[in-house]
Amino acid sequence: MNGNKHLLGFDYAYHISKLLFEQLEELVTGALESMKTGTVTDSFEKLIFAAIAITGIVSGICKGSNQCAIAHKFYEECRSFFYENTLNFLHGELVAVGLLVRLSYFGSDCAYMINELTTLKLPKCLSELNIPTDAVEKFADELCNSSAINDTSDISRKRMLDALEIIKK
């Protein structure tokens, strides 16, 4: 724990998120099988509960601090500017690609996330979302102008363009 009373919630949110991620990893295979067979299993119920309720708790603890704002703004830009292209994708699929951008923007290694998306047969790049790769310029502008970044300086734009390289295929 960092001891700063203003950041204490983030410490708790981090640990809850870590536990949530570990639980989701354990449950996802069984939940996907449950979905394929059309049966509601314990794994499926636990995964749905964790994904909705626990994520809501973490969000509440963080008081809307933009913890995944880049990922959600990416989703919004997909729906705003590439609606027809992304019509057949779920909210979570678009946010997952946005998470790659967020991880890259903050300097995290994306290999694990890319591997997980590949294993689950989920999109991980613009071409898999039916979005042209030259759209990175549009995404960079929109994301830098959004409440997620709110910095239109050349340095910020370059950092965002660099982050978007992870999904430019």
Tell me the role of every PLM-derived stretch.
Residues M1-N2, L20, L126:
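Long hydrophobic alpha-helical segments that form multi-pass transmembrane helix bundles
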